[in-house]
Amino acid sequence: MKLQGVIFDLDGTLVDSEPNWHVSDTAFVEHFGGTFDEPWREQCIGMGSRAFAAVVKKRFNLHQPLEELEALKDRLYLDAARGHTKVFPEMEKLVKGFAVQGMPMAVASGSSLQVIEAVLKDTGLRPYFRAVFSSDETKNAKPAPDVFLLAARKLDLSPKVLLVMEDSQHGVEAAKAAGMRVCALPGVWPKGGEESLRKADLLFEKGPSEFRAEEVLEWIDRTYCQCDDCTLYEMGVCHDPED
């Protein structure tokens, strides 16, 4: 079966935004009198804006509506991110390579749509993507598969012909639960998350520093064929459903 679309996570995958999130999330937690320490930070990697706001709301017994808390979190992030968000060079090379091929691409992130659109516009990446999706549009955030399944429905593509690019444990779990292949480039290996990350179909263990667009494209050539109807592609041989 040939690859027919690629879904990218945003933060830590397409763009080096984790430093900005650390600054804004620290400010968000401190706004309510808390301390955003390292163990808590590791637990929240890949969690998504609304899910993180919900955790803070519960931990500090806050009475503000969840939407209000998420809006504050997003404002703090955009203040930190504008003009300070860099695209990972090899990931930009991969996106442009897919664009030349005419490959449909989308972004599916735990960030709000406002943040996704702002970051993609600020970095010049927005024109490459057919659509963007946020976990805010679904019932459950990653590690549930909801946002990836939403993307598949909107792109009108089967999960099995989609490849997900991810950096987090929650993201890999979500992609696998959606029935999609996933390439992982973890910037952080959270305690207890090693097993999930190693379930990625293609893994760059050292994260973005080790990631190479050319290796991904070569892996795709080995893993997928150009047929619409074969069910298996191994060692360069296509297998027909009737074989």
Question: Model segments located where?
Answer:
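Conserved catalytic-core motifs of eukaryotic protein kinase domains, centered on the activation segment
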Residues: P19, S109, A118
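Residue-level detector of anion-binding/catalytic polar loops
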Residues: T35, P104, R181
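N-terminal start-of-chain detector that recognizes signal peptides
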Residues: V15, D25, L76-L78, P104-V107, ...
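Functionally critical, cavity-lining and gating residues within the transmembrane helices
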Residues: S49, S109, L113
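Asp-based, Mg2+/Mn2+-dependent phosphohydrolase catalytic module
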Residues: M1-Q4, K96-A99, S112-D243
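N-terminal helical cap/lid subdomain that shapes the substrate entry/recognition surface
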Residues: K2-Q101
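Small/polar loops that bind or transfer phosphate-bearing groups
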Residues: D16-S17, C44, V107-A108, E166, ...
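Conserved SAM-binding loop
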Residues: L14, V87, M105-A108, N140, ...
